[in-house]
Amino acid sequence: RSSDLNDLGKKLSEKPAAILASVVCLLVPIQMVSQTWDDHDRSGRYTCRDFGQNYLNSVQDNGKPILFTNGDNDTFPLWYNQDTEGVRTDVRVCNLSYLQTDWYIDQMKRPAYDSPSVPIKWDRIDYVSGHNEAVYVRPEAMETVLNFYKQNPEEARKEFGDNPYELKNILAHWVRAPKDPSLQMIPTDSIVVKLDKEAIKRSGMLAPDSIPEYMHISLKGKSVLYKSELMILEMLANANWERPMYMAITVGPDNHLNLTNNFLQEGLAYRITPFDNVALGRRIDSEKMYDNLMHKFKFGSIDNPDIYLDETVLRMCDTHRRTFVQLATQLIKEGKKDKALKALDYCEKVIPSTTVPHDYVMSSSKEMAEDYIQLGQCQKAEKILNALANNAVEYVTWYLSLNELQFANSYDNCMRYFYILDDVCKTLSEIKDAKTGKVIDSATHYTNKFEQLYKLLEKRANVGSAQ
């Protein structure tokens, strides 16, 4: 009996410990949820859907446009909108990362929703895996080709077409079906495309008064073209500008096929045109872009302070703000100041700094302030510049508080914020007080702050060199 009593006593003494352990274990996930719930709460946030629609609504309303994308964030939200929401099913979204594969080219050659097949006329054997994965660019062959045309003009035209450097002839005679496999190449680094002027006028693109006879595509700096690039050229050769083609602004320059100068921005997409828009002094179709941003774009409730915006969403918010600034700058350049001011004010309304902080680099916020200054809205400019300056001061102050090893590892970042603070101070100094005509107080304040912090930097540098 005594042993039974001892066993009972042990069990009773262990029971509170077990209960306590259970309570502690239950508290751990509760603590985790309470601390991280807001970081994962996506309720009320529609940025993914709306920003995807903004890409789709950046392209022309008619003509069954093709929109080239490259990554995840500029592709899957677009597919979701088309597949689930039924938005802009006339647009063919073409992901360049997949365009290197035969199965995806098969898909592109089939209709989808309200979009006809893309203008790729190659037989499957020409693009099946292992065929035309890459074709070399051989500009050194140009002289030999020209000599062949001089010496044997009829035979040359029969084999390579009237112009061996015209895009259609290069694709047909040099890339797809050369008589000699050793001739499979692109025999020039300067391709031409014969232009149908009437088709261009019908296309809806912003065109100059004088349309040239040819479009020039430079391949300088390229030694090889990969299958996806050949497919872009194939589409360019066959679309005849009546099927609008666009490149999402998030596609990197490496995938631009040296067509960057031919781009004309209309929103979150560049329209591919046959013109050198840099030479024409324009990179934006301001009328189309204004209409898209002001009347078609949605912003997924990012102005709601109760909605959590993570790093990825903030990056896309910065992209949208930057796009507004680019539009406003172009409108100012064109003398359309009323529209420029409306665009900037609307940007501040739908992408407020209370939820999407102004950023010197990512948001083009300094350029936004400069636009406001040009429009005579100095108070609005000062507010933005003060936010940028204050942010830089906080970062520099923090970097200067680090120990020697940490500071040494962070030196470049610290100097970057010194540069930002200095640059913002210069812009603030351009704003004069409306009553006194003198430099505004915030310019003096942040200039003094810069000098104080720079003295601390010099002091730290001297201490470090002495050690």
Stretch-by-stretch model annotation:
Residues 73-74:
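Alpha-helix capping/helix-boundary segments
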